[in-house]
Amino acid sequence: MNQPFCSPVQALRSVLDAAALLPSLSPETIPLEAACGRIAAADLCARMDQPPFDRSPLDGYALHSADTAGASRETPVTLPVVMKLYAGDAPAVALPAGCAARIMTGAPLPEGADCVLMQELTDSGEETVQLYAALKPLQNVVFRGEDVAAGAVIAPAGTVLTPAHLGVLAGQGYAEVAVCRPLTVGILSTGSELLEPSAPWAPGKIYDANGIQNAARLRQLGFAVERQQCSDDPEVITGKMQELLTRCDAVITSGGVSVGQKDYLPLVLEKLGAQLLVEGVAQKPGSPMLAATLGGKLVFCLSGNPFAAAATLEQYAIPALLRAAGRREESCLPARTVCTLTNGFSKPSKGNRYLRATACGGKVTLPGAGNAEAHSSGALSAMMGCNCLVEIPAGSGPVEPGMEVEVLCFVQ
């Protein structure tokens, strides 16, 4: 490392800015029903007013409000019923003054009608109806365009489409939508000690947990993933990196980023001509992280320690990859909130420290009952069930139950 470690804020800003400058992914058109979780490639706008006509929000009678003047249970107004309208009907004629139209929820108001009286305030007559209440103009009417006006932007480009978006788009007659092609990420686990989970265990070896965990997290967010592993050999690492970069939009490695004799990733990036964005972050865990651009693609080199890799994946790699995938920046970032600790952490924090945790209902719980060993960067099992990181600022002492802390909730 030739430069001083940058702050977490600086590191995040650097990778987000770089991601925003990368070439946009080509769009693809897919069926609306398959679009949940995908990213809108362009603004999706309303093609029509919704609702497309003035309609009734209840079962009752469509009326001219002037005809209801003085109506009450003591002095009902009686009107002839000249038409009946259900949802899906199109009124053929206007409603004459001095007449009523029987109308059901969702049915269009006939021309001339300017209010609807609920049936509970009538005698529910079929030929004639007695009105027991007076109405004002426009009372009990759902107006054309009240929900969505024609031309309004339903989902700006970069929006992650939710079931609610799909419902509104379906109401506009969208059968297909243009979305960003999924970004493909190459996952490369480096280490001569690594085995695929399908291989028989051998002395001195460990199974590749990082690769599986990181790939699963990225797939959970909608990325396409290609996963590989290789030995601690700079030539092999270089070849694997080049191979993945020809097929993938970004590459994430784990292992080989510190200052050990077999930590070759800094040399590999230099050999390949990468432009470094981040050369170490002032935090624990994950300080040796590297981030770079190479051939117009993002490369993140994470620690081989499982929690260090998981933390920096959440803090830096995922936000940048989501931005490169076309998301709006605000939806790429871990949501920040303040929660109350239910248990403590006994160590002081000279530098910025991040602890895995579970947040729910304004409270946040550290795994291992606050036991410092549970938060070792090499501990993997304590990550199970966690949905956030607790941020402990540099210079903090031990944190105690009941203290309020900053929490970074994992991006969804």
Model-derived features: where do they sit?
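Generic structural signal for well-ordered, non-membrane alpha-helical segments
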Residues: 4, 8-12, 28, 32, ...
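Short, glycine/charged-enriched hinge/interface segments at domain edges or termini
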Residues: 2-3, 62-228, 373-374, 389, ...
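Flexible glycine/proline-rich
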Residues: 9, 28-33, 37, 42, ...
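Intrinsically disordered, low-complexity, positively charged segments
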Residues: 4-72
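Residue-level signal for inorganic ion chemistry
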Residues: 15, 60, 151, 187, ...
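Helix-rich terminal scaffold detector
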Residues: 1-9, 177-302, 306-312
